[in-house]
């Protein structure tokens, strides 16, 4: 499958399909072992699986460093939450579930292995739920949370009552998972640790392919091979042909395109993007299906919706049912989620943490025809290092860029500040860049930049969103103290290459 050319891995053609899971993967849940303990239960993927098991009647407990909204939702179901990684949760010899975020030295995981307990990787547990029923798996570097949520919402509207395991929070089902009585399971499929290759969907979806996890993949070729295997294991593969890596390297059964790709069975034409909605004609194999209107903005969300259309039609749904459901879809938490408005400034939380995602989000924001203030927290030092130049050039659609220190996600920080170096590099392409050297200072500093009418977009997959409420309060207090006016004077303390390193007490121009 892998050819070596000039000392580098080259991507071979996609192999033939093998859509049935091998016997060694046939390990469904054992009702005679009814207890499960999740190490790191607060994570979005782990909490979704814990929710499904708890709703099925299994006895579930879990541990994590700190409680959050997901653990509190589980506690309301009767799940026992243990703060900290003690051995308390191993009493009674439960089956133990862990994710790739849990290191082998974790005391709970190490003790479970020493005791000979049944231990599941999160992906294997998902596979046990997923591979033995009609399933739809949504994979891709970007857009998989929104696309899987759209498909789930569509099937709910059609009365199919699906089970859903999603990587984001949806108000429609109050969380990141729901247990339905219908036969279909819709799951978001994670490629970050390569575990997508453990799943064998009836319908596999691939939204796009890029390098996003250099902590796991050495290069793009390795990423492509993982997606090739996932596509090979899908009975029917639905994929976006606008992505060159998809169109070139995958054997796609059902393609979709916004750009008129000639091999795409599903196409969006006569596309109109406005500040309120996105609309397009949807064509199926050369015939007009009808008009699609979305509340969620931007070309990336239209592409996500077109994937949902293709899946719905493959399942036999009428286009009118699909279009009605997608017209009602209001998005996923942390995906261009409006957190509130203060003094004419709209505060938005968005999970974008890859250059392509940032570009797509900021393009959608520009449709509002308002000044865009982008606040970005890099996520993982390895990602920032690998994609540094792409990050430096991805903020063109923001009028002001504010960068804060990198969220390491457990990675060791490099010497010096990689986020400050990013700010310096962004300033080579952008006239208005600010750097805040300490995240807790952000609510004290950002209000001095904001103006009535702004869109303040907080971008990142780390803990930046935890500063939004405090920033809104600080901006409200600032408005109460004095009218907000443009500051036209000299900026104190100019730093290298036009970057302002902002202290908490400074009032700066926008």
From Swiss-Prot:
Pfam families: Mur_ligase, Mur_ligase_C, Mur_ligase_M. The keyword Glycoprotein does not apply. GO terms for biological process: cell division; cell wall organization; peptidoglycan biosynthetic process; regulation of cell shape. ATP binds at residues 140-146. GO terms for molecular function: ATP binding; UDP-N-acetylmuramate-L-alanine ligase activity. SUPFAM superfamilies: MurCD N-terminal domain (SSF51984), MurD-like peptide ligases, catalytic domain (SSF53623), MurD-like peptide ligases, peptide-binding domain (SSF53244). Its EC number is 6.3.2.8. GO terms for cellular component: cytoplasm. Residues 1-25 are annotated as: Disordered. It is found in: Cytoplasm. InterPro entries: Mur-like_cat_sf, Mur_ligase_C, Mur_ligase_C_dom_sf, Mur_ligase_cen, Mur_ligase_N, MurCDEF_pg_biosynth, UDP-N-AcMur_Ala_ligase_MurC. Pathway: Cell wall biogenesis; peptidoglycan biosynthesis. It catalyses: UDP-N-acetyl-alpha-D-muramate + L-alanine + ATP = UDP-N-acetyl-alpha-D-muramoyl-L-alanine + ADP + phosphate + H(+). Keywords: ATP-binding, Cell cycle, Cell division, Cell shape, Cell wall biogenesis/degradation, Cytoplasm, Ligase, Nucleotide-binding, Peptidoglycan synthesis. It comes from the Bacteria. PANTHER family: UDP-N-ACETYLMURAMATE--L-ALANINE LIGASE, UDP-N-ACETYLMURAMATE--L-ALANINE LIGASE-RELATED. NCBIfam families: murC. Cell wall formation. Belongs to the MurCDEF family. This is UDP-N-acetylmuramate--L-alanine ligase. It comes from Synechococcus sp. (strain JA-3-3Ab) (Cyanobacteria bacterium Yellowstone A-Prime). The lineage of its organism: Bacteria, Bacillati, Cyanobacteriota, Cyanophyceae, Synechococcales.
């Amino acid at each position: 499958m892998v050819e070596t050319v000039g000392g580098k891995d080259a991507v071979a053609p996609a192999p033939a399909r093998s859509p049935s899971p091998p016997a060694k993967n046939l390990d469904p849940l054992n009702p005679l072992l009814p207890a499960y303990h999740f190490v790191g239960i607060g994570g979005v993927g782990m909490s979704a699986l814990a929710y499904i098991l708890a709703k099925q009647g299994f006895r579930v407990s879990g541990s994590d460093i700190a409680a959050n909204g997901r653990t509190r939702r589980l506690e309301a179901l009767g799940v026992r939450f243990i703060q900290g990684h003690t051995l308390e949760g191993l009493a009674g010899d439960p089956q133990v579930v862990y994710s790739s975020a849990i290191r082998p030295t974790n005391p709970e995981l190490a003790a479970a292995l020493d005791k000979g307990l049944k231990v599941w990787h999160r992906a294997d547990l998902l596979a046990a739920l997923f591979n033995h029923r009609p399933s739809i798996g949504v994979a891709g570097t970007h857009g998989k949370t929104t696309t899987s949520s759209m498909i789930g919402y569509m099937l709910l509207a059609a009365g199919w009552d699906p089970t859903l395991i999603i990587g984001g929070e949806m108000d429609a089902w109050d969380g990141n998972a729901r247990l339905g009585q219908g036969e279909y399971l819709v799951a978001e499929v994670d490629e970050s640790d390569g575990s997508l290759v453990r799943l064998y969907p009836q319908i596999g979806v691939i939204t796009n392919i890029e390098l996003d996890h250099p902590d796991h993949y050495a290069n793009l070729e390795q990423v492509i091979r993982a997606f090739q295997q996932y596509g090979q294991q899908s009975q029917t593969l639905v994929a976006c042909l606008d992505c060159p890596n998809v169109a070139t390297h995958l054997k796609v059964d059902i393609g979709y395109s916004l750009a008129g790709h000639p091999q795409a069975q599903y196409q969006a034409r006569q596309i109109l993007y406005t500040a309120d909605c996105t609309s397009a004609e949807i064509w199926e194999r050369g015939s007009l299906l009808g008009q699609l209107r979305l509340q969620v903005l931007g070309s990336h969300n239209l592409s996500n919706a077109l994937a949902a259309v293709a899946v719905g039609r493959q399942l036999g749904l009428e286009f009118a049912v699909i279009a009605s459901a997608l017209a009602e879809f209001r998005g996923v938490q942390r995906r261009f989620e409006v957190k509130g408005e203060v003094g004419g400034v709209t505060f938005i939380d968005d999970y974008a943490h890859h250059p392509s995602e940032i570009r797509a989000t900021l393009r959608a924001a520009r449709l509002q025809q308002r000044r865009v203030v982008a606040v970005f927290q890099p996520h993982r030092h390895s990602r920032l290092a690998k994609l540094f130049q792409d990050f430096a050039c991805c903020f063109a659609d923001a009028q002001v860029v504010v960068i804060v220190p990198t969220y390491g996600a457990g990675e060791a920080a490099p010497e010096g500040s990689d986020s400050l170096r990013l700010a310096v590099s962004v300033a080579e392409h952008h006239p208005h860049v600010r750097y805040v050297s300490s995240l807790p200072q952000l609510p004290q500093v950002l209000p001095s930049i904001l103006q009535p009418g702004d869109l303040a977009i907080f971008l990142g997959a780390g803990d930046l969103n935890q500063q939004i409420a405090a920033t809104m309060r600080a901006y409200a207090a600032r408005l109460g103290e004095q009218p907000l006016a443009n500051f036209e004077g000299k900026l104190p303390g100019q730093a290298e290459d036009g970057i302002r390193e902002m202290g908490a007490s400074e009032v700066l121009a926008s």
